[in-house]
């Protein structure tokens, strides 16, 4: 999504980028069901600590995003649902890459 890319690009050039994690998740599978479950969706993680250029195929759910945010911020789970959610460890690395993000231009005429 062009708008999301531009937002991440701007934020990655800010002084806050070294301590930032951005999660982008669709609220539904947009075009509807296809040959796979319509309950699945995509989640994008942008951070100096995010693994760049990889597709993580680990099955997470929306509560996993919340659980990951709680762990990053060092706060306890709010309830049993986020306490039992799988944290998104596969999306991150211990070594930060502070290179700013560059949004791709639109290729739709």
Name each model-derived stretch.
Residues 1-109:
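N-terminal pro-sequences and low-complexity stem/linker regions of secreted or lumenal proteins
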